[in-house]
Amino acid sequence: MNILKHLLVLSALVLFISCAKKAPDLINLAQSNLDQNRENDAIENLNTLLDKYPNDSLASLAQYKLASIYKNWKNDPANFIKSLEKTVNNYPNSLHAKQAKKEIASFQDWIINNAETLRKRKLTSESINNLIYLVENFPQHELAPKAQYIVGDIYMNDLRDFEKALSEYRVVLSNYDGSKEEALAQFMIGYIYANVLKDFAAARKEYQIFLDSFPNHELHPSVKFEIEYLGKDINEIPALKHITS
């Protein structure tokens, strides 16, 4: 009986050893997962490698590959930057850490570019989420005003949610005064009231704020023209009358 028991234990041990995946197996399996667009499985296998073999020579590759998945497959800026930072902190002397440092330095630029790419692909919610992540986590960064302005632009031109667009443009005014996006946001607020909502009193007020605040802006002549002919039919505007004649 004891011999049988020992044989069963030995068989189970052999089976366990044969089934246990080593670091190279997990790396290869993760790549196979990605080739089949099974990124969640790839993430699981890479995390298994990092948990079981944190000091393996392939660990830095696994950590950096996680960052790549969050960047290129998941469009997940939070986990992307977290994975990059882990690559640098846990494997500081690796080639992957060197590359991760470069990507950390250009992280905010990547968010803007990725958001625009997502927008072109009609992945509007993902685009907005990327931009909001930048604004909320890096409010003092030089690209934060641009990110906030693009959010307003998406609501204006893509989603056609004009009240929300007004709200997002006003965030630019309140949080990023002095930025180049401030004047553009003020103009767009007046434009929406004048040309979309047809609230000419509100449009006049917002346009006047623009004229007073940005007297040297390139849009100044356009705003003066808009104010002069607010609410008028095209036939009542001498400069445009020829269009309908």
For each feature predicted by the language model, list its residue ranges:
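Sec-dependent bacterial lipoprotein signal peptides
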Residues: 1-19
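Acidic, polar-rich low-complexity tracts and alpha-helical solenoid repeat scaffolds
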Residues: 3, 18-245
